[in-house]
């Protein structure tokens, strides 16, 4: 081997080791059976399921069976100007959507924010179809539904979920950290808060009931610049409400997402005989006091699982959620699991 070859070899090794030392890794190839997603939610249009998730302009996948997925573009090619004007630091990476079909119209709710701040807003766009090949396919943005303002609001306007009650009333639950999960009544258009406003607290993590987050990413540590930089230690987010039998069930995610092998994300649930609560867990502890019956928690392969949605397939219910997968270098991947109910009416899944 010549000196030139040795020099080239050691140069290559140096670059590889340097890249490894800096934590550089390639994004995994698209896996149709377990695609990389954060914060999944899905709805069926015709014979096709469409999945929406966090991403630039809101990422979309499609599937005939909730099993094998393929990319289906994104919702926004042009970002809503109101969001750019309202939320400093928002540049199009749109979080935690929710999808709803009501009276022939699809409503897509979405979150505009930046990590660790509660200067945030929830918007909504509508469409007559989810099929991009249809001549009726066109997303029409309806603007801001609700926003949170730093220094004014001890809650965070992200992670929306809209539930239509049996009387036709629309309710939006939302929240992440700060004061926890809130519920507000929507007007008949499902695009604005109803007046007079009705607000209900649903879930929070009082001191001593949540994991200590004080030593996590700098972006979410307390900061003297004000409440916008102090989410507190109340790790709860991602509400999702379903009705089963005579009960309303509130699913939320507790503890820490997005930490790779150190993720502690989990899904818990409480139930109530009213959509407005109070929600309690199987032991009778209110979710407003940090209660929650565990539905899904981490294991050796998936240390953190959370941000769930529930869909009805006609043959039962499926829970969609994301998990940090050891086999993909702890990238967030989609899990789809059967939602089972025990004889006492409490849900569970098998990872």
Which residues make up each language-model segment?
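Bacterial N-terminal signal peptides
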Residues: 8-18
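Carbohydrate-active catalytic/glycan-binding domains of CAZyme proteins
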Residues: 20-351
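Positively charged n-region of N-terminal signal peptides that target proteins for export
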Residues: 1-5
């Amino acid at each position: 081997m010549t000196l030139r070859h040795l020099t080239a070899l050691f140069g290559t090794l140096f670059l590889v080791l340097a890249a490894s030392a800096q934590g550089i890794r390639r994004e995994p190839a698209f896996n149709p059976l377990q695609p990389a997603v954060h914060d999944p939610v899905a709805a069926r249009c015709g014979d096709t399921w469409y999945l929406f998730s966090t991403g630039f302009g809101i990422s979309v996948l499609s599937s005939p069976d909730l099993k094998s997925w393929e990319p289906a573009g994104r919702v926004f090619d042009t970002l809503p100007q109101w969001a750019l004007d309202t939320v400093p630091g928002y540049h199009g990476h749109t979080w935690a959507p929710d999808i709803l079909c009501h009276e022939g119209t699809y409503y897509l709710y979405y979150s505009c924010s930046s990590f660790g701040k509660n200067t945030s807003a929830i918007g909504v766009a509508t469409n007559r179809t989810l099929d991009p090949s249809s001549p009726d396919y066109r997303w029409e943005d309806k603007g801001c539904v609700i926003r949170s303002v730093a220094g004014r609001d001890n809650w965070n306007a992200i992670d929306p979920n809209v539930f239509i009650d049996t009387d036709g009333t629309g309710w939006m639950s939302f929240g992440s950290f700060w004061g926890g999960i809130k519920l507000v009544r929507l007007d008949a258009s499902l695009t604005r808060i109803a007046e007079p406003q009705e607000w209900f607290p649903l879930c929070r993590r009082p001191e001593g009931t949540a994991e200590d987050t004080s030593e996590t990413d700098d972006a979410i540590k307390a900061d003297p610049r004000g409440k916008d930089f102090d989410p507190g230690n109340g790790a709860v987010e991602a509400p999702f409400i379903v009705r089963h039998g005579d009960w309303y069930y509130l699913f939320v995610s507790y503890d820490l997402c997005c930490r790779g092998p150190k993720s502690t994300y989990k899904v818990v649930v409480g139930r109530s005989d009213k959509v407005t609560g109070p929600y309690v867990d199987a032991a009778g502890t209110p979710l407003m006091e940090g209660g929650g019956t565990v539905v899904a928690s981490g294991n050796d392969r998936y240390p953190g699982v959370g941000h769930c949605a529930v869909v009805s397939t006609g043959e039962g219910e499926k829970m969609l959620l994301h998990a940090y997968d050891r086999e993909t270098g702890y990238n967030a991947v989609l899990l789809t699991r059967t939602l089972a109910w025990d004889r006492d009416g409490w849900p569970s899944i098998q990872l």
